A protein has these predicted regions:
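Terminal substrate-recognition subdomain of acyl/acetyltransferases
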Residues: 1-49, 54-57, 144-218
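A broad, low-specificity signal marking well-ordered, structured residues that form hydrophobic/aromatic
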Residues: 11, 66, 79, 113, ...
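A short helix-loop-beta-strand connector motif used in the catalytic cores of GNAT acetyltransferases and
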Residues: 55-67, 88-89
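Short connector loops at helix/strand junctions that flank enzyme active sites
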Residues: 60-63, 76, 108-110
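Conserved beta-strand in the GNAT
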Residues: 67, 73-83
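Short, flexible loop/turn elements at secondary-structure junctions
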Residues: 70, 83-85, 119, 191
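Acetyl-CoA-dependent GNAT
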Residues: 81-87, 107
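Acyl-donor binding region in acyl/amide transferases
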Residues: 91-170, 174-177, 181-185
Length: 218
């Protein structure tokens, strides 16, 4: 599956199926180590790609996955949002040994969404911040439609600073750990915490085909 969501003169954004997951995971891992570490061996990186790919397959049935491609059909960005069933172990369990449900006041209306595999290429001559905002908006869109939607994520510490400056109010659950070559922090945000970011940048995706994609994935 590959459905066009948005198109401009620099790139196209698609909603894609699980057949793209391996390429997405490889892109994310490669970009992370390109930014943060030059000391990992090829074997170590390949093993991480394999492990993360298998993890992503376990999320695929209730995930919405987005990729951005340039005019040469090269991946330049991606993100995945997963509606969590509270049974499958998330990265936050495995990396930090914590259960986010111990920190969130759950009600019968609560729904939980894990955002991950978020990366934008460092080798593009476009406004990466605009692509960054669009991809993040696609990910939080279904969360914000819920009565009591919660975002759960593990975010690079520098990226988290940018997200917070852009208006997202996140709650840190634990101090950072090294993951994929950088300090990574476990966070969550409720609907109120997402509100400022959502309303500031909803105009970025108003003309996109996001509603159709959301309805299909619900």
């Amino acid at each position: 599956m590959k459905n066009l969501i948005s198109k401009n003169e620099n790139y196209c954004i698609y909603s894609v199926g699980k057949e793209y997951l391996y390429d997405i995971v490889k892109f994310v891992v490669d970009e992370n180590y390109k930014h943060h570490s030059k000391f990992e061996t090829v074997n170590n990186i390949n093993e991480e790609i394999k492990t993360i790919y298998e993890e992503e397959l376990s999320f695929a049935e209730t995930s919405q996955i987005y990729i951005a491609e340039d005019s040469f059909q090269r991946m330049i960005g991606c993100i995945r949002v997963y509606k969590w069933d509270k049974k499958v172990l998330l990265p936050i369990h495995k990396i930090f040994n914590i259960n986010p449900l111990n920190y969130i006041k759950e009600t019968k209306n609560s729904s939980f969404w894990h955002i991950g595999r978020f990366a934008v290429s460092s080798n593009v001559e476009i406004s990466t911040i605009r692509l960054f905002k669009k991809l993040m908006m696609y990910a939080i869109f279904p969360i914000y439609q819920e009565k009591e939607g919660y975002m759960i994520a593990e975010i690079d510490s520098k990226l988290l600073q940018i997200i917070n400056r852009l208006g997202m109010d996140t709650v840190c659950l634990k101090s950072g750990e090294c993951y994929l070559g950088s300090e990574t922090i476990p966070v969550y945000a409720d609907k109120e915490g997402l509100s400022k970011f959502y309303h500031s940048y909803i105009s970025e995706i108003l003309l996109d085909n996001i509603n159709q994609c959301y309805i299909k994935a619900a």
